[in-house]
């Protein structure tokens, strides 16, 4: 990220934000409520044009196929299809997006791996339950199960610990550590402490403008 600036409703959220991430990094995005943590995650994921500056992947703009094929984005919306079962959702997700290793090469995900992922997030016995019959927390677990099968090198996780219990948090932290140790990059936001070694941080509050400062940025539109 190089000299990023972003506005919302003609108000500058942050400016001159620069950071470099390398293989093995686990980075927590910090900031007060409304500071723009989710906005920054969406910018990095390529889901927002409302900024100036650059986001580079392998020294190239982060808009090409190679970048999108290398990212798993977990946002506030789970992306779970209500009419499908938990297992069908995972089949649909990996059938639509494919699964890539850290070199962005396609790899297969077996039925056994999908079922094991649901077990790991505490949904054993829910494989064939339609998601419209599940609670909000259970739907979030279905979405989190993708992480247990994904080999995408970049994980962008916006509040991944929401609606999971202590055991689930510890398990997810272990998964994040393992991903970084295998050469992946993890950017995350969280309202609770994150217990992983060598955790790096980017504090958006350090890049916020003076109170009341307005923006004259010329930016694109979200798509």
UniProtKB/Swiss-Prot annotation:
EC number: 7.6.2.5
Catalytic activity: heme b(in) + ATP + H2O = heme b(out) + ADP + phosphate + H(+)
Residue numbers binding ATP: 31-38
Bilayer disposition of the protein: Peripheral membrane protein
UniProt GO MF annotations: ABC-type heme transporter activity; ATP binding; ATP hydrolysis activity
Subcellular location as annotated: Cell inner membrane
Name of a matching Pfam family: ABC_tran
GO aspect biological process, one term: cytochrome complex assembly
Entry keyword set: ATP-binding, Cell inner membrane, Cell membrane, Cytochrome c-type biogenesis, Membrane, Nucleotide-binding, Translocase, Transport
GO cellular component: plasma membrane
Residue ranges of domain ABC transporter in the record: 1-223
Domain of life: Bacteria
Quaternary organization: The complex is composed of two ATP-binding proteins (CcmA) and two transmembrane proteins (CcmB).
Functional note: Part of the ABC transporter complex CcmAB involved in the biogenesis of c-type cytochromes; once thought to export heme, this seems not to be the case, but its exact role is uncertain. Responsible for energy coupling to the transport system.
PANTHER family reported for this sequence: ABC TRANSPORTER I FAMILY MEMBER 1
Family: Belongs to the ABC transporter superfamily. CcmA exporter (TC 3.A.1.107) family.
Protein name: Cytochrome c biogenesis ATP-binding export protein CcmA
């Amino acid at each position: 990220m190089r000299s990023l600036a972003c506005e919302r409703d003609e108000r500058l959220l942050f400016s001159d934000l620069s950071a470099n991430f390398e293989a093995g990094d686990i980075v927590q995005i910090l900031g007060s409520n409304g500071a723009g943590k989710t906005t920054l995650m969406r910018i990095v994921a390529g889901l927002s044009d409302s900024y100036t500056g650059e986001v580079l992947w392998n020294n190239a703009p982060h808009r090409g196929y190679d970048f999108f094929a290398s990212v798993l984005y977990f946002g506030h919306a789970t992306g779970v299809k209500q009419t499908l079962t938990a297992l069908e959702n995972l089949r649909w997700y990996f059938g639509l997006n494919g699964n890539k290793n850290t070199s962005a090469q396609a790899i297969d995900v077996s039925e056994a791996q999908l079922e094991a992922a649901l077990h790991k997030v505490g949904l054993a016995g829910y494989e064939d339950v339609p998601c419209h019959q599940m609670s909000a927390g259970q739907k979030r677990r279905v979405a989190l199960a993708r992480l247990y099968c994904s080999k995408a090198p970049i994980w962008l996780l916006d509040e991944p610990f929401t609606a999971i219990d202590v055991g689930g948090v510890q398990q997810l932290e272990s998964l994040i550590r393992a991903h970084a140790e295998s050469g992946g990059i993890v950017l995350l936001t969280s309202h609770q402490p994150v217990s992983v070694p060598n955790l790096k941080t980017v504090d958006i509050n350090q890049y916020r403008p003076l109170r009341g400062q307005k923006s004259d940025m010329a930016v694109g539109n979200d798509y």
